[in-house]
Amino acid sequence: KEYRIIFTEPLDAEITDKEGFGIENLSWCPEVYFADNVIRNNRARGTLFSTPLKTVVERNLFDHTSGTAILLCGDCNGWFETGACRNVLIRNNRFINALTNMFQFTEAVISIYPEIPDLEHQKKYFHGGKGEKGVVIEDNYFETFDRPVLFAKSIDGLVFKNNVIRQNTDYPAFHHNKTRFRLLHTRNVKIEKNNFEDGDESVVRE
């Protein structure tokens, strides 16, 4: 289908007819409360959240989700199905042996992975943003056979605190990402007061 949109106010000067732009209908975006669920043995990923409004994910069990347990995506390049997340709270969840397979967006147990074709020249950030809470990940329990816990790309505002990370040997480690945290084009990131039972708190910033 083709739609014609008529604006009542002038558009920002950055928006021109020289390139394409994606439009999200904010009036159709919900707040999300996702609690007390068991997510188990899923293919590809456990859950995918994508709304600019408040999202709370708490008291869930993510058990052997195969791919990433929680994905915050963002795509106007292929799937055309997700926009930015501005206010996400992930707390008091249990994550057991995610990432037993490799699929799209499976960079860590929690992957914040918008598709940005030219990240090097991106001037702003896709997720989070000025005046927004961004993504807070706190008071969770991670049990994992591999290394990556959090992957984040193009986000302004990210907190990872008061989490417990326990290493096990249930499966052979195989993931190409050998660090706990990998951060690409991020700002206002806090990683603090976490308990890594094996002492590995490795962070890669790019």
Language-model regions, residue ranges each:
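Extracellular parallel beta-helix/beta-solenoid repeat domains
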Residues: K1-E206
